[in-house]
């Protein structure tokens, strides 16, 4: 039986779901992770938490299936995470889409007609 796997990394958790050819759920796993608020208006997630949540949810789903034909990945809006190309390590925490640290700059761009 062909199986489609979806990995949905949301704002506070990762969910991995396996579907059969008729889109019936075969298996589903979810792992939450904490948001970090280092300063007022800042919202971050530790990169290791994000990666661990993928492994934690994907492993049992894949192990319960055979004949995986595709894996789709969704993520949380404009959350940004930068990795060092040489070391493979994250440069900083993921900056979550809710983060407001650049609100003033964005407002200025909008006022200048750069929307």
Model-identified regions with their sequence ranges:
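N-terminal glycine/serine-rich phosphate-binding loop of ATP-dependent small-molecule kinases
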Residues: 1-92, 104
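Glycine- and other small-residue-rich loops at beta-strand/loop junctions that grip anionic moieties
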Residues: 95
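Glycine-rich phosphate-binding loop plus the immediately following alpha-helix
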Residues: 98-115
């Amino acid at each position: 039986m062909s199986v489609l796997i979806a990995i949905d990394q949301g704002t506070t958790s990762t969910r991995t779901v396996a579907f059969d050819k008729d889109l019936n759920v075969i298996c589903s796993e979810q792992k939450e992770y904490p948001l970090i608020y280092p300063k007022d208006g800042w919202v971050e997630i530790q990169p290791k938490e994000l990666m661990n949540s993928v492994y934690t949810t994907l492993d049992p789903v894949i192990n319960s299936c055979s004949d995986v034909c595709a894996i789709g990945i969704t993520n949380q809006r404009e959350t940004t995470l930068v990795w060092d190309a040489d070391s493979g390590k994250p440069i900083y925490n993921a900056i979550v889409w809710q983060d407001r640290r650049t609100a003033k700059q964005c407002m200025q761009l909008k006022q200048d007609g750069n929307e």
